[in-house]
Amino acid sequence: MRRVSVLLLLVLPVAGLAAAAGLFAPLPGGTFKSALQYEDAKGGVRIAPFALMRKPVTNAEFLTFVKAHPQWQRDRVARVFAEPRYLSHWQGATELGPKAEPGQPVTWVSWFAANAYCESIGTRLPTWSEWEYAAAADETRKDARKDPAWRERILTWYSRPSNQALPRAGLQAPNAWGVQDMHGLVWEWTDDYSSLLVSGDNRNQGDADKTKFCGAGALSMDDRENYAVLMRVAMLSSLEGSDATANLGFRCARSAR
């Protein structure tokens, strides 16, 4: 899949690097005890320093992208890269309309389109481990996962009716890393979303496509009370790269320079 997306972007004009440091929050990385335990990483997942977008990508930002890269407009995109519902809430191929406010996180967007957006600004989608690492923080603690009240707050969002209008991105208080909206706004694509529940022994073999689709390694749930993680894994691993839903968006990451 990565080779396909790279080839696509080679023929696109590059939108430029995401130079504004304020859009990204730096995270130091380290050994992270994931709620998902891989057989080959029982002591924790090693996460290199990286930076994560403070907020999810908005409709306005994605509109700028599709105007610059018209092959990602909903009436031109190849169906192998986006299903028919892709950006279906927009008024038109290059018009947002009343159902897609500029400041709301973009949804109805496929993995392929999200990945292309990130690559067009010199970034990438975060891995599951990076996303989980950033999402473990609350407003004051870098790891709040053992707090039952914090977990209950997240589960309350998951039980919210999905037909409610989305708030604007960036309304939540930043967490301890300076990242907003990790919970309570939209689900988010990760680079390796489809490998989360797949068994295999290819995880460290170096083929990006095999890792993405075939090689997660055997998984177990280390913290069985963290139902929110189970829900995220179940949701993401049920999707194809061309799928789009009303409550699934994304944000970009970049490796430390």
Model-assigned labels for residue ranges:
Residues V6-A15:
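Bacterial N-terminal signal peptides
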Residues F24-T31:
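Mature N-terminal segment immediately following signal peptide/propeptide cleavage
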Residues K33-A41, N59-T64, Q73-R74, M221-Y227:
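Short, solvent-exposed loop/turn elements at domain surfaces
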Residues L36-Q37, Y193-D201:
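Cytochrome P450 core scaffold surrounding the K-helix E-X-X-R motif
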Residues R46-W150, R254-R257:
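Active-site microenvironments of metalloenzymes and redox enzymes
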Residues L155-H183:
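Short, well-ordered junction/capping motifs at the entry into regular secondary structure
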